[in-house]
Amino acid sequence: MGVKIIVPSLGESVTEATIAKWYKKEGDAVKTDELLLEIETEKVTLEVNSPCNGTIGKIIKADGANVAVGEEIGDINEGEAVATNSNEAAKPQTASQPVPEKVPKKPAVANNTLAPSVQKLVTENKLDPNNIKGTGKDGRITKGDVLETMNAPTPAATSTTSSAKASEERVERVRMSRLRKTIAQRLKDSQNTAAILTTFNEIDMSKVIALRGKYKDEFEKKHGVKLGFMSFFVRATIEALKLIPSVNAEIDGDDLVYKNYYDIGVAVGTEQGLVVPVVRDADKMGFADIEKTIGGLAKKARDGKLSMADLSGGTFSISNGGVYGSLLSTPIINPPQSGILGLHKTEERVVAIDGKIEIRPMMYIALSYDHRIIDGKEAVSFLVKIKELIESPEKLLLNL
């Protein structure tokens, strides 16, 4: 009897997944820990590797099938992995006919060895995977490798392009990924369940910009990470949550659950959709630790390597639409949380300061909150506290 290929544990509260792509077919030789397939959950894409050497026996669940944790999806005939292409066996050569030397060629990268998200990125940008250096396991190409290739300078074209391609179809129908369906459902559930209201304020970024500019080089030299603005906002948010505990609470049936810990979700946009990895116990971190943690989570998100643990929980979220140029927005709450802070683009605007007209770098901030648990006064006070701390960043450093 063959060795079963089963759906691994997917993390807390996750019981189902979808088979995104098999990389092996029945009869293929495999080695221990070699990639067999990818499965897609509501939040992440996970790799399933071979538990032993052998050949693929039977594939029970094909691409696109919904599967449960622990379910058998195929099996492996255990034994030494053998080459599947018998034509590659060496043939004897006669002594009178010397074999001409051939220049070794770089093996072509087959499309079926690319992860679905990587293949989509390669296809959309008309890239040749053979020209992309893979840094993943066994030299596989990751999304990070594709993005690095896209950002690299390209040499000038040396030949004319081929004849124009036929006009593209005006409509393309693509099946929604499990992640996209989950995002759609959760956002709609949020609007249907919570009494969402949004309040706004604006921040003069002059002092925090000056502080960052003065110490960013010294900070990076000492801590090995760049000093961004997100660490200031995370620290300011935590102080505001301590001042207004209801924003860090949630509704559970007939109870209000007040959380005395601060796990801050930071929204990250990826090719597959929006994910919100969590910075655990952010109140116990300094600026450098916050920047390192956010940077690491963002890289894992872009490379599709977030784990379920990275995405689970969270007591409050921050979304920075400003990195895309957003001037103002009304972010949607990530349930069961009761609030989300929206950051936006900093731009110079004319403002009145002590009766004088001045030009200052200003940012609009927004708090979307569940009005069932948070009163308007509390929501406004929450943003006022953040405004106060960002406009006087020395208070964050002195814990004032």
UniProtKB/Swiss-Prot annotation:
Transmembrane segments: none annotated. Residues 2-77 form the Lipoyl-binding domain. Binds 1 lipoyl cofactor covalently. Residues 85-113 are annotated as: Disordered. Pathway: Amino-acid degradation; L-lysine degradation via saccharopine pathway; glutaryl-CoA from L-lysine: step 6/6. It is an enzyme of class 2 (transferase). Residues 113-150 form the Peripheral subunit-binding (PSBD) domain. Pfam families: 2-oxoacid_dh, Biotin_lipoyl, E3_binding. GO terms for molecular function: dihydrolipoyllysine-residue succinyltransferase activity. Its cofactor is (R)-lipoate. GO terms for biological process: L-lysine catabolic process to acetyl-CoA via saccharopine; tricarboxylic acid cycle. Keywords: Acyltransferase, Lipoyl, Transferase, Tricarboxylic acid cycle. Its EC number is 2.3.1.61. Residues 85-97 have a biased composition (Polar residues). GO terms for cellular component: cytosol; oxoglutarate dehydrogenase complex. It catalyses: N(6)-[(R)-dihydrolipoyl]-L-lysyl-[protein] + succinyl-CoA = N(6)-[(R)-S(8)-succinyldihydrolipoyl]-L-lysyl-[protein] + CoA. The modification N6-lipoyllysine is found at K43. Belongs to the 2-oxoacid dehydrogenase family. NCBIfam families: PRK05704.1, sucB. Forms a 24-polypeptide structural core with octahedral symmetry. Part of the 2-oxoglutarate dehydrogenase (OGDH) complex composed of E1 (2-oxoglutarate dehydrogenase), E2 (dihydrolipoamide succinyltransferase) and E3 (dihydrolipoamide dehydrogenase); the complex contains multiple copies of the three enzymatic components (E1, E2 and E3). E2 component of the 2-oxoglutarate dehydrogenase (OGDH) complex which catalyzes the second step in the conversion of 2-oxoglutarate to succinyl-CoA and CO(2). PANTHER family: DIHYDROLIPOYLLYSINE-RESIDUE SUCCINYLTRANSFERASE COMPONENT OF 2-OXOGLUTARATE DEHYDROGENASE COMPLEX, MITOCHONDRIAL, DIHYDROLIPOYLLYSINE-RESIDUE SUCCINYLTRANSFERASE COMPONENT OF 2-OXOGLUTARATE DEHYDROGENASE COMPLEX, MITOCHONDRIAL-RELATED. This is Dihydrolipoyllysine-residue succinyltransferase component of 2-oxoglutarate dehydrogenase complex.
